[in-house]
Amino acid sequence: MDVYQIELEEQAQIRSKLLVETCVKHSSSEQQQLQVKQEDLIKDFTRDEEEQPSEEEAEEEDNEEDEEEEGEEEEEDEDEEALLPVVNFNANSDFNLHFFDTPEDSSTQGAYSEANSLESEQEEEKQTQQHQQQKQHHRDLEDCLSAIEADPLQLLHCDDFYRTSALAESVAASLSPQQQQQRQHTHQQQQQQQQQQQHPGQQQHQLNCTLSNGGGALYTISSVHQFGPASNHNTSSSSPSSSAAHSSPDSGCSSASSSGSSRSCGSSSASSSSSAVSSTISSGRSSNNSVVNPAATSSSVAHLNKEQQQQPLPTTQLQQQQQHQQQLQHPQQQQSFGLADSSSSNGSSNNNNGVSSKSFVPCKVCGDKASGYHYGVTSCEGCKGFFRRSIQKQIEYRCLRDGKCLVIRLNRNRCQYCRFKKCLSAGMSRDSVRYGRVPKRSRELNGAAASSAAAGAPASLNVDDSTSSTLHPSHLQQQQQQHLLQQQQQQQHQPQLQQHHQLQQQPHVSGVRVKTPSTPQTPQMCSIASSPSELGGCNSANNNNNNNNNSSSGNASGGSGVSVGVVVVGGHQQLVGGSMVGMAGMGTDAHQVGMCHDGLAGTANELTVYDVIMCVSQAHRLNCSYTEELTRELMRRPVTVPQNGIASTVAESLEFQKIWLWQQFSARVTPGVQRIVEFAKRVPGFCDFTQDDQLILIKLGFFEVWLTHVARLINEATLTLDDGAYLTRQQLEILYDSDFVNALLNFANTLNAYGLSDTEIGLFSAMVLLASDRAGLSEPKVIGRARELVAEALRVQILRSRAGSPQALQLMPALEAKIPELRSLGAKHFSHLDWLRMNWTKLRLPPLFAEIFDIPKADDEL
């Protein structure tokens, strides 16, 4: 029975080990080793079983009956053995461990011989020791599994424990020579822990190599290691074999315990037998001499988690946090106030980083480096030449994208229409010419202001609330320039106050604000809209922004100005003056608006005088074919009437000439109808009128506006049209009469004697157009307020262009006196067209000409 007891005990051990392997999921190689071991045990059992019958043959010869009974008992025992592997043993049950520890008075005890009893007692003692060790191992297994359920991090230690325990028997022979090395390693670990406690800042961030566990990569850690990313620091230990003792079989680290050199994880490792033996030894060492204590393991993992929380952040994360804090403390440094291209962004980034870079003044049109002050705007050479060619050749551009192209340095040549429109909106004009050069100090201050604006705009800039919503970085830059020039300008503007007090002698003036600079300022033009709905005046928000931009640029150029507001209170004029140095905006003051007469405060609050000047000036230049530049080199040619051989009488000949001349004259005047309509749409406030009022103003004021434009080409003998063809005095008398021709020539000669510029002619034409006393107007007061604003703009322009001239104060009343004369010529001209209305069937007139003068047309021309 001892043999059977041994056999059952061996099977119980095998079952227990299989259960342990199932719990911890051993690898296939370890399972194969256990299977081989199980087969060896089965072979030993079979060999002992074969020897057992040979010893019992002598006893069986004495009594055959007893042998038969014993044979039956053996068969019964074999049947029981076949059923034993099917039994589901509990690895932790005392039944499996002590099933055959029967008492001494058992009935089966006397059936064995004394020799076998002695051998069985020795074997039982050995088996008892093994059972105790195995029982302790199973208890540790249960403790570790419970710890894993409580904290998943315990799997790292438990997995290492079970792997080493599974290999304990295979390396039992090699454990004894390695015990001394383990003691040294334990001593080294204690020293490292003491060093870490003394120097927490110099903790070693070491990592064990990855351990394969069911296809997942885990970090096997010891009590001196930390969780975290792999460190590249190669720390040298006092012991030569400090790093080799932590290698695992599946690690990617190089380990050489024989050489004792320390290497970092991830390095190239030579797959040698020494590293494999070292890994096996380290695993077996931990299983044989150090039994896993669940409490110690839990405290170790908790200590490691605490160290992980106290681990300092990487350097890159610290830098990102510092940069974020700097951005919160200095948000203004993150704004770029440079150009709209790559060079400006690079410059602003260099300034933010503290790198000094040479700043430059940008071009107002494309953002390129400005070469100077051209046509009233700081611009580059490319935009200066483009604008000069455009105004000299009068090129008409077209945009394929509805005038919404972006104009920057890289693509400024793609759309000429949008580029020219941006030149106009930036303030480029033939009249906006500077007198003198920019002082050197002003240029230096401009450069300093540009560099400081790139670093961040100061918070002390005074910006109007109306412009803050649409403020552009360039506005901030130029407002900073005027802030730097404030002290210099305060010393210059004082003598100019006396000059502008002469405005008290002017007649009735609307309550608007006037800025009269000592040197010609360059306010920005209002944008010329591409759609008819946006025409008829400058948008108030855009105009304020444009004006703020250019008023500050004018101040930066060394000019200074005086804020003059003439208001009417109780029928008496009052001059409200004050210095205006470094002003951010040109809007009307609140107290001045409240004192305006006849409700003009709304108009004065929406548009400034300079907005009106520049809007009307640009409208005139774009839509008038009689400007100074266009007429300077005009090739003049006479209009010759062909001979009529059919006419038999003088009356018939004169009628033929009159018909032919009207056809020629109307054909050349009709293009001016469309131009004047476009000009009227761009006059500030015109599109706010009702459609009926707009139609009345254009139809009744067309000839008067056209005559104001063409007066430059009228002399005592001829009237020259925009194509160079001229009509003689005799031909004009054929069209009209001698009285009308005399009045027309006198008016033109007088107007030419005043020497008006294109801007002044445009403003005067707008005044003529905005006649509030036309018959049939529904809102004459609204038209009258718009006319007063234009009249004030003309007055300011005259004083500005003729500063110091004695005729400056007399010119505006003279021009206002010419308006009734012009109205009389318009009425006479309308009456002369009655002949065309009566004889419209004899000649073919352009439909637009016939429509604007109420001349009947054929049905096919409607």
UniProtKB/Swiss-Prot annotation:
<feature type="compositionally biased region" description="Acidic residues">
    <location>
        <begin position="47"/>
        <end position="82"/>
    </location>
</feature>
<feature type="zinc finger region" description="NR C4-type">
    <location>
        <begin position="363"/>
        <end position="383"/>
    </location>
</feature>
<dbReference type="GO" id="GO:0005634">
    <property type="term" value="C:nucleus"/>
</dbReference>
<dbReference type="InterPro" id="IPR001723">
    <property type="entry name" value="Nuclear_hrmn_rcpt"/>
</dbReference>
<dbReference type="GO" id="GO:0045892">
    <property type="term" value="P:negative regulation of DNA-templated transcription"/>
</dbReference>
<dbReference type="InterPro" id="IPR035500">
    <property type="entry name" value="NHR-like_dom_sf"/>
</dbReference>
<feature type="region of interest" description="Disordered">
    <location>
        <begin position="28"/>
        <end position="83"/>
    </location>
</feature>
<comment type="function">
    <text>Induces the early late puff 78C which triggers puparium formation and development.</text>
</comment>
<dbReference type="InterPro" id="IPR013088">
    <property type="entry name" value="Znf_NHR/GATA"/>
</dbReference>
<dbReference type="InterPro" id="IPR000536">
    <property type="entry name" value="Nucl_hrmn_rcpt_lig-bd"/>
</dbReference>
<dbReference type="GO" id="GO:0003700">
    <property type="term" value="F:DNA-binding transcription factor activity"/>
</dbReference>
<comment type="similarity">
    <text>Belongs to the nuclear hormone receptor family. NR1 subfamily.</text>
</comment>
<dbReference type="InterPro" id="IPR001628">
    <property type="entry name" value="Znf_hrmn_rcpt"/>
</dbReference>
<keyword id="KW-0539">Nucleus</keyword>
<feature type="compositionally biased region" description="Low complexity">
    <location>
        <begin position="475"/>
        <end position="508"/>
    </location>
</feature>
<keyword id="KW-0863">Zinc-finger</keyword>
<feature type="region of interest" description="Disordered">
    <location>
        <begin position="173"/>
        <end position="210"/>
    </location>
</feature>
<feature type="compositionally biased region" description="Low complexity">
    <location>
        <begin position="342"/>
        <end position="353"/>
    </location>
</feature>
<dbReference type="Pfam" id="PF00105">
    <property type="entry name" value="zf-C4"/>
</dbReference>
<feature type="compositionally biased region" description="Basic and acidic residues">
    <location>
        <begin position="37"/>
        <end position="46"/>
    </location>
</feature>
<feature type="domain" description="NR LBD">
    <location>
        <begin position="626"/>
        <end position="855"/>
    </location>
</feature>
<feature type="region of interest" description="Disordered">
    <location>
        <begin position="97"/>
        <end position="138"/>
    </location>
</feature>
<keyword id="KW-0238">DNA-binding</keyword>
<keyword id="KW-0805">Transcription regulation</keyword>
<dbReference type="GO" id="GO:0008270">
    <property type="term" value="F:zinc ion binding"/>
</dbReference>
<feature type="compositionally biased region" description="Low complexity">
    <location>
        <begin position="308"/>
        <end position="335"/>
    </location>
</feature>
<feature type="compositionally biased region" description="Polar residues">
    <location>
        <begin position="105"/>
        <end position="119"/>
    </location>
</feature>
<dbReference type="GO" id="GO:0043565">
    <property type="term" value="F:sequence-specific DNA binding"/>
</dbReference>
<feature type="region of interest" description="Disordered">
    <location>
        <begin position="230"/>
        <end position="353"/>
    </location>
</feature>
<dbReference type="InterPro" id="IPR048008">
    <property type="entry name" value="NR_LBD_DmE78-like"/>
</dbReference>
<dbReference type="Pfam" id="PF00104">
    <property type="entry name" value="Hormone_recep"/>
</dbReference>
<feature type="compositionally biased region" description="Low complexity">
    <location>
        <begin position="173"/>
        <end position="206"/>
    </location>
</feature>
<feature type="DNA-binding region" description="Nuclear receptor">
    <location>
        <begin position="360"/>
        <end position="435"/>
    </location>
</feature>
<keyword id="KW-0479">Metal-binding</keyword>
<protein>
    <recommendedName>
        <fullName>Ecdysone-induced protein 78C</fullName>
    </recommendedName>
</protein>
<feature type="region of interest" description="Disordered">
    <location>
        <begin position="444"/>
        <end position="557"/>
    </location>
</feature>
<feature type="compositionally biased region" description="Polar residues">
    <location>
        <begin position="463"/>
        <end position="472"/>
    </location>
</feature>
<feature type="compositionally biased region" description="Low complexity">
    <location>
        <begin position="230"/>
        <end position="291"/>
    </location>
</feature>
<feature type="compositionally biased region" description="Polar residues">
    <location>
        <begin position="516"/>
        <end position="533"/>
    </location>
</feature>
<keyword id="KW-0804">Transcription</keyword>
<feature type="zinc finger region" description="NR C4-type">
    <location>
        <begin position="399"/>
        <end position="418"/>
    </location>
</feature>
<keyword id="KW-0862">Zinc</keyword>
